[in-house]
């Protein structure tokens, strides 16, 4: 019997994320010397139905310390998992879910559970001398995702008057992932010049995800600036746009309307705004176009915006129960996968498989509070996701993922860049 995969040690600590807030890092060591470590991310605009991120709510770090989550790993989770075979991912995740005993992981904290879940997979991969993407995805993992790079910021990610949160570029016309990164980087530099010329040098300061947050006043103005940046880079034919509205952030529950540029707008009117946008600009995907509980509205938007990828983030929160409801209703046609929304690797894979089985596309995503951890890069390839959003080609916690993907592409030798097939990449 091979006991080299048995978990020998689990240790957690408090470290910092890219916004200077505390987060959980976990390390796992197997008897065979395999090592895995993970730093969990944290979101700024979070869905109401996400798994619970445990914070101490005491004086240190303004109430955001995670020492309780850390001690839950060191004192509770570790005791249960020592001696378990690290290859039994589903069993290990289930043990942690049983230990927690809640629907939303509110006892131990999704940040504690996820840190261990991912670190266990990495330790098992290391013990097997396999890269993580191959350990999770096997020999079928060969699709390099088309990157959605967030280059203009609004909403919760910026201090401007822009209602929509992210304006992204996606180089579907590239021939490889490395070329896609180059196109985005050149466009980013081009956009930087456009923004500086129009709004002054102060406007090229970057937001949480590396995008620029110039003082644009309207959505149309932001899209026009973005288009100018793409044209000046020479990639008008290769690059398309994707939007993350994060509409729950500007939804007024009392009136049942949305606040756009200071005006109250109905669901139907907002869908009309999206229709005008996709006619005028090369937009192929809209994330969270409506309030997170408006499944009916999402159903209407999916029907009305024919051919456009409608991505559920706050709508689904990487949760198979909510995704199942969306599939049955025809609400959205794409799942945004954020591992920390659900809290284990097994549940994340289940959500991805459910999406694919039902004809929904998949976008693997970072959070605004990230780190140098690049696990989601491997996960995107392991799942043949076809799409990844992990910020601008700037800031180390963002480029860590793009750099890892370029390494993977080089290592794979035979791979397929999703490109124009980003919705169904295999």
From Swiss-Prot:
Pathway: Carbohydrate degradation; glycolysis; pyruvate from D-glyceraldehyde 3-phosphate: step 4/5. One of its GO terms (molecular function) is magnesium ion binding. Gene3D superfamilies: Enolase-like C-terminal domain, Enolase-like, N-terminal domain. Its cofactor is Mg(2+). Its EC number is 4.2.1.11. The active site is at 209 (proton donor), 338 (proton acceptor). Belongs to the enolase family. This is Enolase. It comes from Methanococcus maripaludis (strain DSM 14266 / JCM 13030 / NBRC 101832 / S2 / LL). The lineage of its organism: Archaea, Methanobacteriati, Methanobacteriota, Methanomada group, Methanococci.
């Amino acid at each position: 019997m091979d006991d080299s995969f048995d978990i020998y040690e689990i240790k957690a600590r408090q470290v910092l994320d890219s916004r200077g807030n505390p987060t959980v890092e976990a390390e796992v060591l197997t008897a065979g010397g395999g090592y895995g470590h993970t730093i969990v991310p944290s979101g700024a605009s979070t869905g109401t139905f996400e798994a619970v991120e445990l914070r101490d709510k005491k004086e240190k770090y303004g109430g955001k310390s995670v020492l309780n989550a850390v001690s839950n790993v060191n004192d509770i989770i570790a005791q249960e998992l020592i001696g378990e075979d690290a290859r039994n991912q589903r069993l290990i995740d289930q043990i942690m879910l049983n230990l927690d005993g809640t629907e939303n992981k509110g006892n131990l904290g999704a940040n504690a559970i996820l840190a261990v879940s991912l670190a266990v997979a990495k330790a098992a991969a290391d013990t097997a001398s396999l890269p993580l993407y191959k350990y999770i995805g096997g020999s079928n993992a060969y699709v390099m995702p088309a990157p959605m790079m967030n280059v203009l910021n609004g909403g919760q990610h910026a201090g401007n008057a822009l209602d929509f949160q992210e304006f992204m570029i996606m180089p579907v016309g590239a021939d490889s992932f490395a070329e896609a990164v180059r196109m985005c980087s050149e466009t980013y530099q081009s956009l930087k010049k456009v923004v500086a010329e129009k709004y002054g040098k102060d406007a090229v300061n970057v937001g949480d995800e590396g995008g620029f947050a110039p003082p644009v006043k309207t959505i149309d103005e932001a899209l026009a600036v973005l288009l100018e940046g793409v044209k000046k880079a020479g990639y008008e034919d290769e690059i398309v746009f994707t939007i993350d509205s994060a509409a729950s952030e500007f939804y007024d529950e009392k009136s049942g309307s949305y606040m756009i540029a200071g005006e109250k707008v109905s669901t139907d009117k907002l869908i009309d705004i999206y229709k005008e946008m996709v006619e005028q600009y090369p937009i192929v995907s809209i994330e969270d176009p409506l309030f997170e509980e408006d499944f009916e509205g999402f159903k209407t938007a999916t029907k009305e915006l024919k051919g456009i990828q409608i991505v559920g983030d706050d709508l689904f929160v990487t949760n198979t129960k909510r995704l199942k409801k969306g599939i049955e209703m025809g609400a959205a046609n794409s799942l945004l996968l954020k591992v920390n929304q659900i809290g284990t690797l097994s549940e994340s894979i289940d959500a991805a498989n459910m999406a694919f089985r039902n004809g929904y596309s998949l976008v693997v995503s970072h959070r605004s509070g990230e780190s140098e951890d690049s696990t989601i890069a491997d996960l995107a390839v392991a799942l043949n996701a076809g799409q990844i959003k992990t910020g601008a080609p700037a800031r180390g916690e963002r480029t860590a993922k793009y750099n890892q993907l370029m390494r993977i592409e080089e290592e794979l030798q035979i791979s397929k860049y999703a490109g124009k097939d980003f919705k169904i990449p295999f």
